[in-house]
């Protein structure tokens, strides 16, 4: 349960991960805590989900695909082509099994932090954006200057802006777009219409 988890316990449990990834997990955890407090989400849940979102990110793409199949996860054709997208669902499965995390909203935030999905909760949006706002990724997402300020003003619009950028970027690169991202886009258009 989330109540029994602490960042210190998570740091010990995942100390085997590469240092660069651990640093990212710490930054995202801190950003998620701050965004959660701003948007009246439990900051501790934000910090914990932020730390856990990428615990399977260092795994080889072939392993991610094989592991997803072995666990019986539904693998979308886009995930078959781009197995790195499975690191969120596999991280959620891992923390549920290894740590006993049962908080479904936290597990969803971990699962969907790469693609988003329709009907995202505030916690899911917080973790999604905290991952994208990691200062070490600055410059990685050209055209998204101002996203941190927007995340403080309107969480829905900030997530929408990132997802629109992501979809456009993938289209320009000839990449595949996960249907969950399209569902997130359409849902956020509906939510923000008229604002």
Annotate each language-model stretch with its function.
Residues 8-16, 23-24, 33, 38-161:
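Divalent metal-dependent catalytic cores for phosphoryl transfer on phosphate-bearing substrates
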Residues 25, 155, 188-192:
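A generic structural signal for ordered secondary structure
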Residues 155-173:
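Long, amphipathic alpha-helical surface segments
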Residues 168-195:
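Charged phosphate-binding loop/patch that engages nucleotide di/tri-phosphates or the phosphate backbone
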Residues 1-12, 190-195:
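Short, low-complexity, intrinsically disordered N-terminal peptides in bacterial proteins
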